[in-house]
Amino acid sequence: MEGDLINTNKALLPLSWLYGLGVNFRNMLFEMGILKSRSFDVPVISVGNITVGGTGKTPHVEYLIRLLKDNFKVAVLSRGYKRKTHGFLRADKNSTVRDIGDEPFQMKTKFPDITVAVDGKRTRGITQLTSGDSDSQPDVILLDDAFQHRYVKPGINIMLVDYHHLIIYDRLLPSGRLREPVKSKDRADIVIITKCPTDMKPMEYRVITKAMSLYPYQQLFFSTHVYEPLRPVFPKNAKTLGNFKDMNVLLLSGIASPEQMLIDLQERASQITPLSFSDHHNFSQKDIMHINEVFAGLPSPKVIITTEKDETRLLNTEGLSDEVKRSLYVLPVKVSFMLDQEETFNKHIISYVRKNSRNSILAKGKDDNKSKDSDHSGDRPRTISFRNN
């Protein structure tokens, strides 16, 4: 199984032990009530992880937005990583990546009718979102990347685990990728194994389910990434793009884990040149010149493929050559649940929001049509029971 191939640096284990002491002490303060976790009257759903690197948080938050936005007033609260502003900020049509960060900007661009806000202090952010008249208050708040933010006690705590980097085979920072001990998974109400290959065998599901060793109060789901058709970043001058299987592809990415995207694209294109930057990278003019040069050096026919998150940072970047602009395409990604679990997941989320929303009476019964439109496959959900072994 791919999950047990995680490389860790044993030489750094002493530092990991020291780091673990600090993390465990902090968690103990919360468990003892010395540090307080605050609950709110509004339904709060947290999506996050305990590892460094990408686990697919943004696609899963966007899945929840699509699921809820037609029947509830949805707000997303993020810390706005690498933004140039401070404090609480509610996004509007004039907000930029510099104002709110690339991921909140991406969500506000894709879902302009929902509320997107940023604040490093989530309790303050939720208080701001729920203040004022009732008409402006959200029915549900989605916390982006907040599993470790224990000052808020969400109604549903969703933890994401990358199939290719299972936490049960990992170590604490800096020898491994874990930001918290594996036992922190016990705080999750829902655990989702993300980025699963579509051809997973039944034995793999059983092995992972047993290895995760969840409690009866926890639910385990498996999801995979589904790529949508390419679309141009600059549609006005974009060249017509057909099948890119025989084209030279420059894969431009500034995300935490670009390796899986490269592997997935190799099934659709024969010649791929990866050009990777750090996660949330702000492209400098030197970077743009390098991108122009690398792409100019590729033989035709050719295309540049990038991610939705990188698109937000490239749109208003000066210096891209005309050739790059004509050839720059984004590969959108969505989440799809496996094992016919989508309906089970949807009903659980909608039921929680409906029962706890201020507008629960008005919202009652409206989720039926949404469930039909949620693109789930299969006629019957498959339920997995969990036991400690």
Identify the residue ranges that each predicted region occupies:
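Walker A (P-loop) phosphate-binding motif
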Residues: 27-93, 198-199, 389
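Phosphate/Mg2+-binding loops and adjacent switch elements
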Residues: 80-218, 222
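C-terminal accessory "lid"/substrate-recognition subdomains
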Residues: 2-5, 167-301, 363-389
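Conserved beta-strand elements of the Class I
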Residues: 75-77, 159, 248-252
